[in-house]
UniProtKB/Swiss-Prot annotation:
Binding annotation for a divalent metal cation 1: D237, D248, E445
The name this protein goes by in its record: Methionine aminopeptidase 2
GO MF terms, alphabetically ordered: initiator methionyl aminopeptidase activity; metal ion binding; metalloaminopeptidase activity
PROSITE patterns: MAP_2
HAMAP family referenced in this protein's UniProt entry, alphabetically: MetAP_2_euk (MF_03175)
Source organism per UniProt: Ajellomyces capsulatus (strain NAm1 / WU24)
NCBIfam families: met_pdase_II
Length: 464
């Protein structure tokens, strides 16, 4: 167990791991911090010709020759223009300066690069048998990687600021607003004009889940305000996208040191999953590794020792273009599957650990909605539903959105239309997921890109 610290000390993603062996194998890479600036030197301007050179007869008198008055003319010196340097633009606190104004070259920093094992025979097989596929993948690298790295840098800068303001007494609605305002400011897309939110911004509603609420809870308009308390365990899960390239990352904050081992268990389990991820990695092996690491921990609550359990019915997942959930899953418990990770995959490796029964049920309320582009609209007759669907397609596409996002666009009286869309299976609704009352759940998550010759933990920062 970690050493106790003075009261009100925040325990979160910056805590050192009680499993240094894992961190030694997969150390966090120092990511770009919120004060990172890029500047460039303007090139030295070409010196202009002397204005007298264009006068008639100017070419008759060479420099240094004797003039008509018998005096030797002095050679004229061209004035050198001094180099000028662009003013460095720093990120503000809270972060509200668009990254495009800081990174003038529009090139964003790479994240943690992990080379594949040199004794992996499949690496040579991939290079020999799929050369054409790799060349196609490499042709996409510049745009693909830069979009992902920009989204990741936005996520890092926003969450680093947010960690400084998360304290007992803050309202969760204020916290959600700080996160979402920061993302929209740094991507320079407020999402108020039609289609603007599809260019860059929030990939899904900010998840702020307390204690036994594991996932899919966000403040909703008109709901009772929720205030963070000292004994709460808060999970912060938000996504950033740039041109549909989604970075999904989450962390947990606790102030009371009794939860130290719970957070350490989940953080170590996530890092173990990231370490095992790679081209041709067996998902069954990754799942078993995650469970073994997480369930090696115990937590003492109310003078009772409780084992940390891996949550059984929620999983990590691959991420697709404009879709937060793909068709591949990474459970946190031992599973029977022959599925493997593949080159070019993007995975959100996340883990949830619980002091409860580690099985989640749907709670009352709605977290958000997602449009199913493959659903038939043949049975849709209500004009309000058709109008709402048009708004959803134009502003969110297949990205998950919440009621707050609709009302931010000025959409009113949408409840009947939304009910019709959900009933017809055109839009899917997501409920909060909860463990038993009195239990505590923690979460950590990173997005990893499985590139041809390495994996890039794109959301890695110096915080977690």
């Amino acid at each position: 167990m970690g050493s106790k610290t003075p009261g009100n000390h925040r325990r979160g993603p910056n805590e050192s791991s009680p499993h240094p062996a894992i961190d030694a194998i997969n150390p966090p890479k120092q990511a770009a911090a919120s004060r990172l600036v890029h500047s460039s030197l303007e090139g030295e301007s070409e010196g202009g010709e002397d204005e007298d050179d264009d006068k008639p007869g100017a070419d008759l008198k060479a420099v240094g020759q004797i003039g008509n008055n018998g005096q030797k003319r002095n050679k004229r010196r061209k004035k050198k223009k001094k180099n000028t340097k662009e003013l460095e633009i720093l990120q503000t606190t809270p972060p509200r300066v668009a990254l495009a104004n800081i990174f003038r070259s529009q090139r964003y920093p790479e994240a943690e690069i992990v080379k594949y094992s040199t004794d992996n025979d499949n690496l040579q097989r991939t290079t020999a048998e799929e050369l054409r596929h790799i060349s196609v993948l490499n042709a996409m690298d510049d745009e693909f990687l830069n979009d992902y790295r920009k989204a990741a840098e936005v996520h890092r800068q926003v969450r680093q600021y947010v960690q400084t303001i998360i304290k007992p007494g803050i309202a969760l609605s204020q916290l959600a607003e700080e996160i979402e305002d920061g993302v929209r400011a740094l991507t320079n897309h407020q999402g108020l004009e039609t289609g603007d939110a599809l260019k860059a911004g929030m990939a899904f509603p900010t998840g702020l889940c307390l204690n036994n609420i594991a996932a899919h809870w966000t403040p909703n308009p008109g709901a009772k305000e929720v205030i963070l308390k000292y004994d709460d365990v808060l999970k912060i899960d938000f996504g950033v996208h740039v041109n549909g390239r989604i970075v999904d990352s989450a962390f947990t904050i606790a102030f009371n040191p009794v939860y130290d081992n719970l957070l350490a268990a989940v953080k170590d389990a996530t890092n173990a999953g990231l370490k095992e991820a790679g081209i041709d990695a067996r998902i069954a092996h990754i799942s078993e590794t995650i469970q073994n690491v997480m369930e090696s921990y115990e937590v003492e609550l109310n003078q009772k020792v409780i084992p940390v359990k891996a949550v059984r019915n929620i999983t990590g997942h691959n991420v697709l273009h404009y879709k937060i959930h793909g068709d591949k899953q990474v459970p946190f418990v031992k599973t029977q599957t022959n599925q493997r990770m593949e080159e070019g995959d993007v995975f959100a490796i996340e883990t949830f650990g619980s002091t409860g029964k580690a099985y989640l049920d749907d709670a009352t309320g709605i977290y958000g909605y997602g449009y199913d582009e493959n659903a038939s609209t043949a049975g849709l007759h209500h004009s309000s539903a058709k109008s709402l669907l048009k708004t959803i397609k134009e502003n969110f596409g297949t990205l998950v959105f919440s009621r707050r996002y609709l009302e931010r666009l000025g959409v009113q009286r949408y409840h009947l239309g939304m009910r019709s869309l959900v009933t017809n299976g055109i839009v899917q609704s997501y409920a909060p997921l909860v463990d038993v009352p009195g239990s505590y759940v923690a979460q950590f998550e990173h997005t990893v890109l499985l590139r041809p010759n390495c994996k890039e933990v794109i959301s890695r920062g110096d915080d977690y």
